Amino acid sequence: MSLALIGFLMVATFMTLIMTKRMTPLVALIVVPTLFALLAGFHAGLGDMMIDGLKKLAPTGVMLLFAILFFSTMTDTGLFDPLVGKLIRLVHGDPMRILIGSVVLCALVSLDGDGSTTYIITMAAMLPLYKRFDMNRLHLVCLLMVTSGVMNLTPWGGPTARAASALKLDPATLFVPLIPGMIAGLAFLILLAIHFGRKERRRIGKVELPAVLDAADLAVSQWPEARRPKLIWFNAVLVIALLVLLVWGVLPLPILMMLAFAIAMIANYPDTKSQKERIAAHAGNVLAVVGLIFAAGIFTGILSGTGMVEAMSKEVVGVIPPFLGPYMAPITALLSLPGTFFISNDAFYFGMLPILAEAGAHYGVEPMAIARASLMGQPVHLLSPLVPSTYLLVSLAGVDLADHQRFALVPAALCCLVMTVVGMLVLAFPFVG
């Protein structure tokens, strides 16, 4: 049995187990790759592969740990209560306005380039509205994920930087022609939000709000004793400073999150008893997310260490018949959907993209065009169980990963299609070389 086939079977088995809910993602991420690695004969060195995978995802795990603690602490202090209060008054109990607002807020927050931070902030602001009006949280999770996938194409976002690095291209030159496609993707999401809004209107109608709402009605924070209204401006400046430093890149993101959390704790809860209470209040959420991140390290470590990723990439490229060569740009866009879903962004852009670019060059398709086309699948990529921030998103929303994947797959794929068509229309990449 070829290594590529084993790799595809491993991913298919994993997806089947979690989508049929026969195994939790945490357990499947550990057990499935281990069994398939042993089946492929990689008894020696298996532990080293796992450790390598854990090392690569360790910074992400640390970042998420302290990001959840920091933004949860900010929520506890009441920092987001005024924002949610303003939103509640603006939407006037209309589910459609809430859904459209979710897309707009996520698009703005996504400019920081980090999906985890985006999810934490937008969830803190929007989830209370969905709970209050008993709206379907799968709508929220779908809209946030696909919006984040569209906004992920900014030059400081991971995929664009990877594609530029892999083919030695200028990120800014790579990015600018993609802007019309991104705008089209966001327009599609607004229409999707309107569609979801009509469904919610039929289901729950327009919620009548009291003429006068007290502070408790508008609060996101769950523990009144943890609120710090006198420190709201300090906390706001702290969050803004964190986001500025994040974009500026003066320190690694995990370090920034650790420092921000420590400062927030000292300023808002100076006594150790209060600090322990705040940490304990969010420990369950932290454990659920970080545990999945490290389990994903086992999966990606084995996928890379065994050489399955390279073998899978070559097999995918090898099935493209010569007569389709001139159409390498749209083919690359199409391949980016399953490609970035089944293997990590690193594996796709550093392993598969150079092969696709080389194949395209033989038919007159420039590497720049192939690179742009390869970014079209990002909304579907975020559905992948290999994406750490996806676990954070579903955990914060309290929805099942498999339910989210089934619900969001078609909208995400349609958004990719819209971006691809517009990308070809504005000549970001050609239909035919």
Give the ranges of each region predicted by the language model.
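Membrane-core helix-loop-helix motifs of multi-pass transport proteins
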Residues: 128-213, 220, 366, 376, ...
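Hydrophobic alpha-helical transmembrane segments of multi-pass integral membrane proteins
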Residues: 63-66, 93-125, 319-358, 362-363, ...
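Transmembrane alpha-helix interface/packing and boundary motifs in multi-pass membrane proteins
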Residues: 14-22, 71, 105-114, 145-151, ...
